[in-house]
């Protein structure tokens, strides 16, 4: 039996207070995942490790803790990855889809996204369906939209001499 990997992530833009040791969202993600695991007889007894990228974008996968987690996954030491929702895994539609449909199944790793109601064990030999693809697409668009809004606000502040 492999190790259960908890993956937590929060973007820099979403951090609550500068200098805070850990964001409230990371604490909430951990509590949600731990509550889910406590209610699962199948998963609650597994050895677990946590990987946390606090303040890292989800638009790419060059995140220190994600890469560390993937080293363990590739060494065949992981049985399951659990996240709060698929947007915590990433916000790049193509890459998240590649991980869910190709990489994790090839490596024999189960993926659970608690709030999305997604468990890859229910989709063996199949993808998660249109709802999973649509969620990932929305996550990607959300990130792009937020980026444009931030750039726009910064341009306004620059024109006003506040930045």
Where are these regions (language model features)?
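N-terminal cationic and glycine-rich segments that engage phosphates or anionic surfaces
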Residues: 161
């Amino acid at each position: 039996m492999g190790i259960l990997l908890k993956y937590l992530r929060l973007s820099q833009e979403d951090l609550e207070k500068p200098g805070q040791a850990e964001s409230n969202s990371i604490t909430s993600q951990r509590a949600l995942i731990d509550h889910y695991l406590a209610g699962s007889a199948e998963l609650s007894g597994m050895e677990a490790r946590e990987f946390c990228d606090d303040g890292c974008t989800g638009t790419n996968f060059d995140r220190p803790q994600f890469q560390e987690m993937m080293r363990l996954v590739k060494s065949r030491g992981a049985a399951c990855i659990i996240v709060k929702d698929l947007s915590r895994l990433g916000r790049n539609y193509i890459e998240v889809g590649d991980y869910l449909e190709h990489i994790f199944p090839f490596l024999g790793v189960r993926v659970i996204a608690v709030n999305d109601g997604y468990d890859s064990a229910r989709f063996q030999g199949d993808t998660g369906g249109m709802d999973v693809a649509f969620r990932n697409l929305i996550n990607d668009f959300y990130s792009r939209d937020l980026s444009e809004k931030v750039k726009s606000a910064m341009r306004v502040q620059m024109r006003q001499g506040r930045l």
